[in-house]
Amino acid sequence: SYAHSDNSPDAGFGVIRGDYYYLPLLQLGPDYAPYANLLQSDVLVINIQTDKVEKLISETATHLAMPSQPSYNSCIFMNENKDIYIMCAGYFGFNPENTHSGLVCIPNKGELAQTDFDSSKSWDISSTPIEGTPYKPNTIYSVVYLGGGKVAAFVSAAELNVKDPFTDKNGIAVLMDLNARTIKKIDGIPYTDSHSVGIAKYKDLVVFGVSGKEKRGLFGYNPTTGTTQQLLTTTGGADFFYAFE
């Protein structure tokens, strides 16, 4: 078993690269949080022809934990070089002693023997300022890769927690740059709660699901023009959407 301290390693969403399926293991404890004695990111490398686990690789240097996310398959992605990036939410901001979150990377080295994490490409965002705000992230909720090293994301700021981190409007829509290691607030999208943080691409827009204090629904962001608009108003919080023509 690849589980730590229980019977399930808690598989997240995976991705296929070449002949192998990369399956992150969230390794969650009974409180749906990482084990304090296993602050790392584990990934199984599985042969898609034989379904055999070829190796288990772990990123232990940065202590980024909870790789992938069971709610959003976009939390694991490949860039143009087929380097795999995996979002790590850590403690979802519930542990003030551990606000480490961000992304870990498995570069495209080609050969199975060379396949492993590169901790120099990991990014712990907890010390990165969110430009346009006075905050730094205490967790990351969701991501969508846009290309060119740019990532649309929802991150959280502890200072925005007033009463209840489940319902407080602590989620900030941001644009992250994997190369420059910067995080910028996207103006025009309200702060949201931790359960309305879905992101998806639709045509030339990035669509954010929002449950704001005054506005709720789907908000579109055009990364080319930098403009935002509310696309749909809802009564409750919006998370997923399906578009058809």
Range-by-range predicted roles:
Residues A36-D51, N98-L112, T167-N179, Y221-N222:
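Beta-propeller blade signature
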Residues Y22-Q40, Y85-G102, A153-K169:
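Short, conserved, GDST-rich strand-edge loop motifs in beta-rich repeat architectures
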Residues T133-S211:
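Loop/turn-rich, solvent-exposed surfaces of beta-rich toroidal or solenoidal domains
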Residues S1-N7, V53-Y72, G110-N138, K185-D193, ...:
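Surface-exposed loop and turn segments in beta-propeller and other repeat-based domains
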Residues S1-N73:
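Long, acidic/polar, low-complexity amphipathic helices and coiled-coil-like
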Residues D6-G18, L28, Q69-I84, Y135-G148, ...:
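Structural signature of eukaryotic scaffold interfaces centered on beta-propeller domains
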Residues S211, N222-E245:
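Blade-level signature of beta-propeller repeat domains, shared across WD40, Kelch, NHL, RCC1
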Residues Y20-L23, N81-M87, G149-A153, D204-F208:
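Entry beta-strands of beta-propeller and related beta-repeat scaffolds
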